[in-house]
A protein has these predicted regions:
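Extracellular structured ligand-interaction cores
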Residues: 156-162, 240-242, 253-256, 268-270, ...
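Bacterial N-terminal signal peptides
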Residues: 2-13
Length: 588
């Protein structure tokens, strides 16, 4: 966390070279860019001199990249609060005052937009690719793409290290144009104002680890440290940085930018790296070719606890090809052949991380066969506040339950569950997970279920992107008693949704149905609907439009129907019931 040290920043000695004077050390080199936003003394005060932790030995391979001026001018961030704390210290993209920070009155980074999603996933994220704006590259997104963007943003709460490492290298290599990253010139990044172009590119490249099917498995499996050094010795003299370097261990993973190799003698080598937690500083990964081992120590920031990755503690090290990161990735939500389900979760408060267990079950409640899914950990080390949750890839055609068991929780614990698949996705938001509880969320092609061992208030969303129209149905039982099972059954061909539960007393529900097409969007909601025991809600939206509400009833056990009113979601209604209505991609 930067906040703890922000008020101690003072003007002290400058540690970057004067304008026009080249510096051949491994931290900085070339001409400094003009237009400094941050006084260079800030970096000296926070991160120490450029020689702290620097590589040692004789340079035997050098790409020419330097953390200054080719790295980003502010450190890695995770949550919106982290980003605002960076803005307080570094003034980027706009200065945040302490009063604004304390009052939560600051601008958070925008989620991935249509242009960024198209660059990563292709035009299938657009509802109608023919409607792409030729000037801006934007389009109306399918609902699944909006939910995917939200998932990537949620997954990055542990940090954007992979995106920062890849973007800095790709910019230096000329693989990304400067205006796509917001830099002042080709490869010159030190004066980057860190506006929306930088945020969009960093975030979408961070998301590549969720989307490229072989990226995380290869990074986690690792490779021989000795062979890795030989690869860098062979490729870096070409004047580009072809790889992101990843380390992975029990504490999680990290991604950094390798740009030079130094020979320390006696079989020891230092790999000079730009670690995006330490702007403008050269750090070293040490490799012992005698034992084919490595060692690297880093931290979220200089004031936080450090993490060590090494062969001794069974960590792995790998190179990820920048070309693979920049390539168009398979789209897990675009309309087309079922590629399986990408299951993702919001990050956990670090204080709770050891108390939360995630399992997959069959619809009958038995453990799901392990050959039907694979689990991977994103390349994010835990921060002082957040720890990333795993990613789970489930084979096509598999219906399953997600079980989340909580032990003794030390902090407030909301949870989001994303189940993303081609054309149809599901989402669960639980504002508060209770200690010593278990929740179960069922994911199927046309049904969703929920149950908890403690009282709760789940919000369940199902999405479907058709050829011309996208639909979004939501159910929110308020004050759901423990052990009560909730069902949300969606007959998409008949355009009907049934909301039911096993409750033995009256429950109160919010239900919402949204239709989106190129001509516009219409959303209808019924709020605080009382539903007696054994009754259900039936919504028929087959004839609904922007001006015609869906038909809706509370259907009693004896099949008696009581009509219920659904009202159009308007700006004024959103203002009045902001905490109870869904945006298109969910309530987050």
């Amino acid at each position: 966390m930067i906040m703890a040290i922000s008020l101690s920043v003072v003007l002290v000695g400058i540690a970057v070279p004067a304008s026009g004077s080249p510096d051949t050390n491994l931290a900085s080199g070339g001409k400094p860019p003009g237009g400094w936003i941050v006084d260079p003394s800030v970096y000296q005060s926070i991160f120490g001199g450029v020689g702290v932790g620097a590589p040692q030995g004789t340079v035997v391979a050098d790409s020419g990249f330097r953390p200054y001026p080719h790295g980003f001018p502010m450190p890695n961030w995770g949550t919106n609060l982290d980003f605002a704390q960076n803005a307080l210290v570094y003034g980027m993209p706009t200065r945040v005052t302490l009063e604004q920070l304390d009052g939560d009155k600051y601008q958070s980074p925008a989620p991935l937009n249509a242009l960024s999603l198209r660059r990563s996933l292709g035009n299938g994220v657009c509802r109608d690719p023919r409607s792409i704006d030729p000037k801006t590259g934007k389009c109306d997104l399918i609902l699944g793409a909006e939910l995917l963007a939200q998932m990537i943003e949620t997954g990055a709460q542990g940090g954007h290290c992979f995106g920062l490492a890849a973007a800095a290298a790709a910019l230096y290599n000329g693989q990304l144009p400067a205006n796509q990253v917001g830099a002042s010139g080709l490869g010159i990044n030190a004066a980057n104002p860190m506006g929306d172009p930088a945020i969009q590119t960093i975030t979408r490249l961070f998301g590549a680890q969720f989307l490229a099917p072989d990226l995380l498995p290869a990074a986690v499996a690792g490779q021989s440290p000795t062979e890795l050094v030989e690869t860098l010795k062979r490729t870096l003299p070409g004047g580009t940085v072809p790889f992101v370097l990843t380390v992975f261990g029990e504490s999680g993973g990290h991604a950094i930018t390798p740009y030079a190799v130094l020979d320390r003698g006696n079989g020891l080598y230092d790999i000079a790296v730009y670690d995006n937690n330490f702007p403008f500083r050269a750090l070293a990964v040490t490799v012992d070719t005698n034992t084919d081992s490595f060692l690297y120590t880093s931290a979220v920031n200089p004031n936080s606890a450090s993490y060590t990755w090494s062969t001794a503690n069974k960590s792995t090290i790998a190179l990820v090809d920048i070309d693979d990161v920049l390539a168009q990735q398979p789209c897990p939500v675009c309309r087309g052949k079922d590629q399986g389900t990408l299951l993702a979760f919001s990050s956990f408060p670090s204080a709770n991380a050891e108390e939360i267990t995630i399992v997959l079950l069959t619809p009958e409640g038995q453990p799901l066969a392990s050959d039907l899914y694979r689990t991977l950990q994103p390349l994010n080390p835990p921060t002082e506040s957040q720890q990333s949750a795993p990613l789970i890839f489930v084979d096509p055609g598999v219906d399953f339950l997600v079980g989340v068991a909580a032990g003794k929780l030390a902090a407030s614990q909301p949870i989001e569950v994303y189940a993303l698949s081609n054309g149809a996705s599901s989402y669960l938001l639980l504002d508060e997970v209770t200690s010593d509880s278990t929740i179960v969320f069922g994911v199927g092609e046309d049904a969703a279920t929920f149950q908890s061992t403690k009282a709760s208030s789940p919000r369940i969303q199902q999405l479907y992107d058709g050829r011309t129209t996208s639909y979004d149905v939501n159910g929110h039982p308020l004050l759901l008693p423990k052990e009560v099972k909730v069902n949300q059954d969606w007959d998409r061909s008949a355009k009907k949704v049934r909301y039911s539960s096993s409750a033995k007393r009256t429950l109160t529900w919010n239900v919402q149905v949204t239709g989106v097409r190129d001509s516009g969007e219409a959303s209808w909601v019924a709020l605080r609907v009382p539903v007696p025991a054994a009754a259900e809600i039936l919504v028929d939206y087959s004839r609904a439009s922007a001006t015609t509400a869906p038909l809706a009833w509370v259907v009693a056990k004896d099949k008696t129907r009581t009509p219920m009113r659904m009202q159009r979601v308007t700006d004024s209604l959103v203002d009045q019931y902001r905490d109870q209505l869904y945006a298109v991609q969910g309530p987050s």
